[in-house]
């Protein structure tokens, strides 16, 4: 009897990942099961932590750092439908248009944006640490001949302080504990505490900061605004697999938890008063990726009174705009550290929203859109001719520089285009792939065939001069069985096209000398009957 492993079979479902991502996108647009609200410059976006953490290293660190890698508790008795609360995240350092494009990318695997908004999307992808979007935007900008903008130091500093503030608040909430016997951990809002006063030099301590929360009064669940139709549920296997695709990044976990572990002590009921105390610690210069400057933060502080205000309903026009965006889900997010997976992602097909043509390859959809808009951003500096693609401009510049990169291996001939070399190779190989459908003559080049069809050496004459001659030319009697065959006319092969071709050439050659001489019957029979057919024959008979 075989082992249990021998009885196992694997049934793949290739469309499952895209269908799962499509369902998550539909839930996001309807506001169902969303456990996070992102605010930026007065606009709000409902989304899921698991999807954001799977696509963005920044969000993964924001949701897990200091929380042991667990998902933030949402069972604190919020006022949203379904008895669940939703976290609120303020990201004023990312513009609404760029954030909307990145959220659409996270749920549809398609980055849809305009060429003018490409630098803003690149800046937002750098702040949120989305490697595949950064690589695609850099490739598009470099292909367009534009220089990628440098990261904004103020936004980088605000993003760093925002992340550190959440890590500090989460660590403190975990150490404060919860009384035994209480199953659900309290909801900790995602709104950060007021940032510490700016220091002359931005540093980060080598040791973790010592911070704690002081609680007063009732439970802090009222700090979380109401969210319509929000339900919480444990992560499914597919969502856990999607979150785990990014793996470990940079040493610090990218986390999604802001609640103490189950079974810990609960703080006393009352609004949370965040006070961070830092001890004397050894400091060193912060190690951060190149290009991320350090500057003083100008982010305004948020008081507890402002955080406790009621949430305004989402603008219906905004929901209609989000619903109208491209929704075709193809594949979930990929591991930015895996080059092979990133290469496969760059080859994912994208659909044109205008003509619905499937475009393959990253960065080719904006290039295809220029065919609809008529935009030609690449201009020749010599003659001023404009092109929609940069590679076409480079090929055009060879006409001015004299460069001929395609050389024949059999002779010294060089060519400007690859198809010219391909046609030239027929001369060496003897191949004649272009055949005339009238006279069956073959040619090595297509332009030779076109010249043959338009010239005087084929059955169908199409020159303008021939049409004028046809009007003034005398009408000769049509060919019949009694017409004598001109010299050199071969009718033995039985091809009607060849006969018509030879006959047309014969009439054309005899047009200058007059009509041909025809006989009414065979000369031998006429001589036997004694009926002269020509003046010379009559004179011969009279003399005889």
UniProtKB/Swiss-Prot annotation:
Biased composition annotated in UniProt, kind: Low complexity: 511-522, 531-544
Chain positions with Phosphoserine modification: 150
Knockout-associated phenotype: Mutant females are unable to efficiently secrete milk lipid and to nurse the offspring. They show normal mammary gland morphogenesis in puberty and alveologenesis in pregnancy, but are defective in triggering the onset of lactation upon parturition with large cellular lipid droplets retained within alveolar epithelial cells. Mice are more sensitive to cold temperature, with impaired cold-induced transcriptional remodeling in brown fat and diminished browning of inguinal white fat.
Inducing or repressing factors: Expression in mammary glands is induced by insulin.
Residues with Phosphothreonine modification: 373
GO biological-process terms attached to the record: adaptive thermogenesis; lactation; negative regulation of CD8-positive, alpha-beta T cell differentiation; negative regulation of gene expression; negative regulation of NK T cell proliferation; negative regulation of T-helper 17 cell differentiation; negative regulation of transcription by RNA polymerase II; NK T cell differentiation
Keywords: Acetylation, Developmental protein, Differentiation, Disease variant, DNA-binding, Isopeptide bond, Metal-binding, Nucleus, Phosphoprotein, Repeat, Repressor, Transcription, Transcription regulation, Ubl conjugation, Zinc, Zinc-finger
MF-aspect GO terms: cis-regulatory region sequence-specific DNA binding; DNA binding; DNA-binding transcription activator activity, RNA polymerase II-specific; DNA-binding transcription factor activity; DNA-binding transcription repressor activity; histone deacetylase binding; identical protein binding; protein homodimerization activity
Stretch list, region Required for interaction with and acetylation by EP300: 348-404
Crosslink site: Glycyl lysine isopeptide (Lys-Gly) (interchain with G-Cter in ubiquitin): 210, 216, 339
Outcome of mutating residue 343 to R: No effect on acetylation levels. Slightly decreases acetylation levels. Decreases acetylation levels
Disease connection: Defects in Zbtb7b are the cause of helper deficient disease (HD) or helpless disease. HD and helpless mice are distinguished by the virtual absence of peripheral T-cells of the CD4(+)CD8(-) major histocompatibility complex (MHC) class II-restricted T-helper subset due to a specific block in thymic development. The developmental defect is selective for CD4(+)CD8(-) cells; the maturation of CD4(-)CD8(+) and gamma delta T-cells is normal indicating that lineage commitment is specifically perturbed without affecting positive selection.
PANTHER family in the cross-refs: AGAP004733-PA, ZINC FINGER AND BTB DOMAIN-CONTAINING PROTEIN 7B
Assembly information from the UniProt record: Homodimerizes. Interacts with NCL, NEDD4 and YBX1. Interacts with HNRNPU (via RNA-binding RGG-box region); the interaction facilitates the recruitment of long non-coding RNA Blnc1 by ZBTB7B. Interacts with HDAC4 and HDAC5; the interaction allows the recruitment of HDAC4 and HDAC5 on CD8 loci for deacetylation and possible inhibition of CD8 genes expression.
Stated name of the protein: Zinc finger and BTB domain-containing protein 7B
Gene this chain is encoded by: Zbtb7b
């Amino acid at each position: 009897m075989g082992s249990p492993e021998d009885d196992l079979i694997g049934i793949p479902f290739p469309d499952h990942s895209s269908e799962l991502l499509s369902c998550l996108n539909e839930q996001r647009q309807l506001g169902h099961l969303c456990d996070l609200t992102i605010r930026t410059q007065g606009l709000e976006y409902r989304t899921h932590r698991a999807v954001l953490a799977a696509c963005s290293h920044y969000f993964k660190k924001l949701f897990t750092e200091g929380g042991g890698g667990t998902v933030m508790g949402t069972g604190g008795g919020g006022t949203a439908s379904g008895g669940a609360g939703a976290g609120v995240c303020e990201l004023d350092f990312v513009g609404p248009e760029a954030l909307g494009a990145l959220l659409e990318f996270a749920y549809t695997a398609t980055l849809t944006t305009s060429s003018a908004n490409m630098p803003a999307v690149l800046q937002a992808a750098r702040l949120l640490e989305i490697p595949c979007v950064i690589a695609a935007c850099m490739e598009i900008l470099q292909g367009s001949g534009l220089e990628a903008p440098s990261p904004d130091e103020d936004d980088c500093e605000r993003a760093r302080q925002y992340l550190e503030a959440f890590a500090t608040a989460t660590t403190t909430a975990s150490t404060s504990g919860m009384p035994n016997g209480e199953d659900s951990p309290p909801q900790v809002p995602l709104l950060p505490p007021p940032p510490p006063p700016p220091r002359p030099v931005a540093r980060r301590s080598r040791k973790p900061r010592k911070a704690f929360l002081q609680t007063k009064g009732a439970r802090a669940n009222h700090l979380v605004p109401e969210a319509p139709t929000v339900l919480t549920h444990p992560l499914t296997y597919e969502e856990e697999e999607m979150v785990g695709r990014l793996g470990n990044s940079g040493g610090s976990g990218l986390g999604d938890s802001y609640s103490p572990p189950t079974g810990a002590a609960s703080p006393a009921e009352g609004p949370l008063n965040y006070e961070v105390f830092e001890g004397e610690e050894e400091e060193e210069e912060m190690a951060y990726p190149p290009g991320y400057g350090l500057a003083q933060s100008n982010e305004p502080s948020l008081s507890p009174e402002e955080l406790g205000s009621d949430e305004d309903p989402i603008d219906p026009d905004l929901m209609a705009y989000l619903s109208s965006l491209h929704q075709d889900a193809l594949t979930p997010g990929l591991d930015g550290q895996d080059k092979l997976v990133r290469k496969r992602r760059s080859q994912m097909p994208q659909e044109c929203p205008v003509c619905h043509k499937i475009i393959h390859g990253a960065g080719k959809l904006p290039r295809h859109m220029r065919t609809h808009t008529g935009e030609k951003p690449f201009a020749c500096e010599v003659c001023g001719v404009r092109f929609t693609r940069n590679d076409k401009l480079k090929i055009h510049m060879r006409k001015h520089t004299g460069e001929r990169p395609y050389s024949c291996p059999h002779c010294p001939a060089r060519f400007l285009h690859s198809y010219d070399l391909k046609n030239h190779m027929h001369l060496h190989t003897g191949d004649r792939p272009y055949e005339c459908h009238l006279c069956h003559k073959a040619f090595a080049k297509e332009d030779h065939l076109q010249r043959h069809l338009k010239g005087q050496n084929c059955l169908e004459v199409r020159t303008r001069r021939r049409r004028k001659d046809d009007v003034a030319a005398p009408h000769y009697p049509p060919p019949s069985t009694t017409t004598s065959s001109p010299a050199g006319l071969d009718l033995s092969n039985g091809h009607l096209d060849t006969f018509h071709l030879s006959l047309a050439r014969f009439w054309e050659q005899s047009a200058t000398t007059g009509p041909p001489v025809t006989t009414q019957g065979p000369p031998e029979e006429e001589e036997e009957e004694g009926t002269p057919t020509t003046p010379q024959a009559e004179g011969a008979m009279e003399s005889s």
